[in-house]
Swiss-Prot record:
The EC number(s) this enzyme carries: 2.4.2.21
Keyword Protease: no
The name this protein goes by in its record: Nicotinate-nucleotide--dimethylbenzimidazole phosphoribosyltransferase
Pathway as given in its UniProt record: Nucleoside biosynthesis; alpha-ribazole biosynthesis; alpha-ribazole from 5,6-dimethylbenzimidazole: step 1/2
PANTHER family, sorted: NICOTINATE-NUCLEOTIDE--DIMETHYLBENZIMIDAZOLE PHOSPHORIBOSYLTRANSFERASE (PTHR43463:SF1)
Catalytic residues as annotated in Swiss-Prot or TrEMBL: E318
GO MF term (any one): nicotinate-nucleotide-dimethylbenzimidazole phosphoribosyltransferase activity
Cysteines joined through disulfide linkages: none
Family from the record: Belongs to the CobT family.
Superkingdom assignment: Bacteria
Keyword terms: Cobalamin biosynthesis, Glycosyltransferase, Transferase
Reactions that this protein is recorded to catalyse: 5,6-dimethylbenzimidazole + nicotinate beta-D-ribonucleotide = alpha-ribazole 5'-phosphate + nicotinate + H(+)
Stated role: Catalyzes the synthesis of alpha-ribazole-5'-phosphate from nicotinate mononucleotide (NAMN) and 5,6-dimethylbenzimidazole (DMB).
Organism: Azotobacter vinelandii (strain DJ / ATCC BAA-1303)
């Protein structure tokens, strides 16, 4: 395996398909530009997929799970046992993302990268790639070893390759891990060079005292590791989580393999920011599903010059916001591909 595989070139966008799609939009039976962003989405997807009429009928959803050592600092109201329990809930169909995946007819891949209290035997349908019983507490040292960080990145890459081999049209990454908003907030604060208080939110429902404690924990982590903020791979190792690293690896691999990625909420967007810092060329392959309720999400999206599709006040994670946005992409593609042209419908075109 190439040690720095994430630096490999991203697949270039197909400018011929882009031009053909743009010309098709001009010929459809509607005032030009009247479908707003849906038109631009269809044209961009055409460039990504290399075809005049893109399709998003086979989405692939991968959920990466991993626990965080910083949970012992009381930054989440939930115990770490919940991570493994939710993996079982995903597998048995009871979680929000399970419902949405069924609705979409999407493949739902579940990957346990390292839970503090893993379920034995692993629930049917859960792929186990054990990197450790969660990360270390980043107030005491780096969250991950070098080996763990590289293996987590590779786990995301390998998921994308499975999706590509299965003929997926779109890749969605999701996450599960108690205390992972603390990790994401610390990473965002370091990468954006912004204060923790501006980025840290309540996560899964902290009260005011819990939020203050979480801010203080992130500030201590930045004091310990912040000198490495300009080194994205090292700051990921020091402040990140297995699932965040896997998501970053997945987004990098999507660009290299030529598979469009739809980025979910705050944690996934932080992983996307890391991916772009590691290899800026991957940015073209990232679509952003929604703007969530976590205060740091808006700032991360701004740093990525991202224009999210939805704004519903979501803060669940699991890839749920991205799954909710898939029908919008499908509609953009169907309108683009199935509407009649002025010539086909024998309708006069005002521009001709």
């Amino acid at each position: 395996m190439k040690h720095d595989w994430w630096l490999s070139a991203a697949r270039p966008l197909d400018q011929t398909a882009c031009a053909l799609a743009a010309e098709r939009q001009r010929r459809l039976t509607k005032p030009r530009g009247s479908l707003g962003r849906l038109e631009r989405l269809a044209i961009h997807l055409a460039a990504l997929q290399g075809r005049e009429r893109p399709v998003v009928e086979r989405p692939w959803i991968a959920i990466f799970a991993g626990d965080h050592g910083v949970a012992e600092e009381g930054v989440s109201p939930y115990p770490q046992a919940v991570t493994g329990q939710m993996l079982r809930n995903f597998a048995t169909g009871g979680a929000a993302i399970s419902v949405l995946a069924r609705q979409l007819g999407a493949e739902l891949e579940l990957i346990d990268l390292g839970t503090a209290e893993p379920l034995e035997p692993p629930p049917a349908g859960v792929r186990r790639r054990h990197l450790g019983p969660g990360t270390a507490n980043f107030l005491r040292g780096p969250a991950m070893s070098v080996r763990q960080g590289l293996d987590a990145l590779a786990a995301g890459r390998d998921s994308v390759r499975r999706a590509q081999a299965a003929g997926a049209h779109l890749y969605i990454g999701g996450e599960m891990g108690i205390a992972n908003t603390s990790s994401a907030s610390a990473l965002a604060s370091a990468l954006l060079e912004q204060p923790a208080a501006a980025l840290v939110g309540p996560g899964t429902g902290l009260d005011a005292a819990g939020l203050a404690r979480k801010v203080a924990v992130v500030e201590r982590a930045l004091a310990l590791h912040g000198a490495h903020a300009g080194e994205p791979l090292e700051i990921l190792r020091r402040l990140g989580g297995f699932e965040i690293a896997a998501l970053a690896g997945a987004y990098l691999a999507c660009a290299q393999e030529g598979l469009p990625a739809l980025v979910d909420g705050f944690i996934c967007s932080v992983a996307a920011l890391l991916a772009v810092r590691l290899n800026p060329a991957c940015r073209d392959w990232l679509l952003f599903a929604h703007r969530g309720a976590e205060p740091g999400h808006r700032r991360v999206l701004e740093a990525l010059a991202a224009e999210p599709l939805l704004d519903l006040g979501l803060r669940l994670g699991e890839g749920s916001g991205a799954a909710l946005a898939v029908p919008l992409l499908q509609s953009a593609c169907r309108l683009h591909g199935e509407m009649a042209t002025f010539a086909e419908a024998a309708v006069a075109d005002a521009g001709r």
